[in-house]
Regions:
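N-terminal membrane topogenic signal
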Residues: 1-11, 93-95
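Membrane-interface coil-to-helix junctions
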Residues: 17-60, 64-69
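Juxtamembrane "helix-exit" motif on the non-cytosolic side of transmembrane helices
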Residues: 22-30, 108-122
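Hydrophobic cores of alpha-helical transmembrane segments in multi-pass inner/ER membrane proteins
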Residues: 75-80, 131-149
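Transmembrane-helix motifs of polytopic, lipid-linked glycan transferases
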Residues: 75-93, 107-111, 141
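Soluble catalytic regions of membrane-associated enzymes that act on cell-envelope
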Residues: 182-355, 363, 368-392
């Protein structure tokens, strides 16, 4: 019984990693998968090198559609690989558990890939490598046992479990290192998973956990705030100085493919969302996330026949029948869509303008909101948020005149108007609701910020001002999300 203790400990540590630390990533990985038993539906995989093996590994990925089941499933596989590796190495009891270094290397590789794990490669590679090494180590163990007999000797004296201690150390470091170096990836995947179940509060909490959010986190944070009706009140609660995302140079280095379709959909731009998802399907082959996006977008555009075709294609994938049934009922009875709170919120932002996607600047979800002139109150708020994000004060002034007719101007908007009044004093007369306290607040910020306006080193600015002023448009306008082009202390563009 004692010889199984090292493997039980490894199982616990692998479970912590696969269910907890990296659980959201593996769960999202299942959304980047598509599998069907129909070889025609899987032709995009089968025609690739190792296509048949990837088809099998995509099937073996199916348990990952549940975070706990998938995490425990992976932990068991990794523990088996540990045991098989020990058998292959024919280690003594002192070294039981040292085989965990092999599965740890697979996980280290997965962590090192970052967003590339699903944005730039076959999504089933992790499972593929685990099963490949399981098969290899078991074959080697059998061959070695046939040709070499292990010498047995009584081990009476106590021996430190060196192998187990080494494995515990490497697995603990793996868990800690993954959270430190891949925090943004873990949180953004968790936000995408929560988006599927409309857990807006959970998405907002995740965004606030990030020490230095990337573009994916900022995008999903904006979606959640917009769905909660809090975009103009809380959009600057996170830092917009995005760290670079390391991607393989395949079809460009832009990480926006991770969130563009969702941003378009939740801006009530179903045609651009559909178009983007379709392009990704053509380039990468069918993926569950984009396939569901195309179903929702075609349904919102009342393309019932097209939606039915996609539903039939999705129904070939195991465990997706519930989603298929839901949208089949909605096609038969559109009122069901109108009663879905998520869809209701999306449709509240419907455009009154007829235009083409190319009529607006890219990305469309920002370009449309900057360019739209006739819109619902909810679209007006999203449009104002886009103007604030882009530091477009002319657009802020134009939209504020309409926004004040339906609600009190939010703090961020008032700050932007006071900033604009430095060059156009008449703005303060146009918006008498701007209080003296707001003017004093802006003046106080100007006094504290003036020594740093010409400074390119943002780290010193961050330390001096962010704690007090970070959650404000004032800090964002002068110091946040700025590119290298700065003229007279004013930011000329954003990321």
């Amino acid at each position: 019984m004692k010889k199984f203790i090292p493997y039980l400990i490894c199982l616990v540590l692998f479970t912590v990693f696969c269910c907890g630390i990296y659980g959201p990533v593996f769960l999202h990985l299942s959304q980047e998968n598509y599998f069907a038993f129909d070889s025609e539906a899987m032709a995009f995989v089968l025609r690739e090198p190792l296509g048949t093996l990837y088809w099998i590994s995509r099937f073996l990925m199916l348990p990952l559609q549940n975070q706990w089941i998938g995490g425990i499933y992976l932990a068991i596989l990794l523990t088996l690989l540990t045991w098989f590796t020990d058998r292959t190495l024919r280690v003594s009891s002192k070294w039981y558990g040292i085989g965990a270094l092999l599965p740890a290397c697979i996980l280290i590789w997965a962590v090192s890939r970052g967003y590339n794990l699903f944005m730039r490669s076959e999504p089933s590679k992790v499972v593929f490598y685990i099963y490949a090494f399981l098969l290899l180590t078991e074959i080697l163990a059998l061959v070695i046992s046939l040709f070499f007999k292990k010498k047995t000797s009584a081990e009476k004296s106590f021996k430190w479990p060196v192998g187990l201690l080494c494995s515990i150390l490497i697995l603990v470091l793996l868990n800690v290192g993954a959270w430190i170096y891949r925090q943004n990836l873990i949180l953004s995947c968790d936000m995408q998973n929560k988006l599927l179940i409309a857990d807006w509060d959970g998405m907002i909490e995740d965004a606030l956990k990030a020490k230095n959010p990337d573009k994916s986190i900022a995008a999903f944070h904006a979606i959640a705030l917009n769905q909660k009706g809090q975009l103009l009140e809380k959009m600057f609660e996170i830092d917009y100085d995005f760290p670079p995302t390391k991607l393989d140079d395949k079809d460009g280095l832009d990480e926006s493919e991770n969130f563009t379709a969702e941003c378009n959909l939740f801006s009530c731009l179903p045609q651009p969302a559909y178009h983007y998802a379709l392009c990704q399907q053509v380039v990468e082959g069918p993926r569950l996330r984009f396939l569901k996006m195309m179903i929702i977008c075609s349904a919102l555009q009342q393309e019932d026949a097209l939606c039915s075709r996609y539903l039939a294609f999705l129904d070939k994938m195991p465990f997706q029948h519930e989603f298929v049934e839901t949208w089949e009922r909605r096609l038969e009875n559109p009122q069901l869509t109108a009663e879905d709170p998520t869809m209701v919120r999306i449709l509240q932002q419907v455009s009154f303008e007829d235009g083409f996607e190319n009529d607006y600047a890219r990305p469309c979800y920002i370009g449309f909101n900057l360019g739209v002139r006739r819109a619902t109150p909810e679209t007006l708020k999203a449009s104002m948020a886009a103007a604030l994000y882009c530091k477009d004060l002319d657009n802020v002034i134009f939209r504020a005149a309409y926004l004040k007719q339906i609600e009190a101007l939010p703090t961020y908007v008032q700050e932007a108007l006071v900033v604009a009044s430095a060059k156009r004093p008449e703005i303060l007369q146009q918006f008498p609701e701007i209080s003296d306290m707001m003017k004093i607040r802006v003046s106080s910020f100007a006094n504290e910020a003036s020594p740093y306006l010409e400074q390119e080193d943002t780290s010193e600015v961050y330390e001096a001002l962010y704690e007090k002023w970070g959650n404000s448009f004032l800090y964002y306008y002068y110091f946040g999300n700025r590119n290298r082009a700065v003229q007279d202390g004013f930011v000329t563009a954003v990321n």
